[in-house]
């Protein structure tokens, strides 16, 4: 998600920049890594392509915005981590204003495709 630093304007606005609207954070991130790699003398081309692939495939599926599906184990692991991170952030947001002792159902969430509530575990 390194490309988000260029995709979005500074806080508190967090609006999309022109570059963000046109290219998106995935492409911007791959370009940023490519530019940095070019400054490292002797950096292996194969590894550079593998790193850029991981960035391009980190959303995991074409319908989620990735221009490529993961074709490397590392890219697949990164896409899983990105997916779990997004889902856990959604849960955190759901429970932000819910008291810790509230174990009532919070309603259906489209991203999680589930009705959600806190567990009773302490």
Regions found by a protein language model. Give the residues of each.
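N-terminal intrinsically disordered, cationic/polar leader segments
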Residues: 79, 96-98, 103-113, 117-122
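Divalent metal-dependent catalytic cores for phosphoryl transfer on phosphate-bearing substrates
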Residues: 1-98
């Amino acid at each position: 998600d390194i490309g988000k630093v260029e995709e979005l304007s500074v806080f508190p606005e967090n609006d999309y920049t022109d570059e963000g609207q046109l290219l998106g954070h995935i492409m911007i991130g791959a370009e940023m890594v490519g530019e940095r790699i070019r400054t490292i003398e002797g950096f292996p081309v194969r590894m550079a392509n593998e790193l850029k692939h991981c960035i391009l495939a980190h959303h995991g599926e074409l319908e989620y915005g990735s221009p490529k599906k993961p074709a490397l184990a590392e890219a697949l692991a990164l896409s899983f981590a990105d997916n779990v991170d997004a889902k856990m952030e959604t849960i955190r947001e759901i429970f932000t204003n819910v008291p810790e002792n509230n174990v009532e159902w919070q309603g259906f969430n489209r991203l999680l495709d589930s009705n959600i509530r806190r567990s009773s575990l302490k």
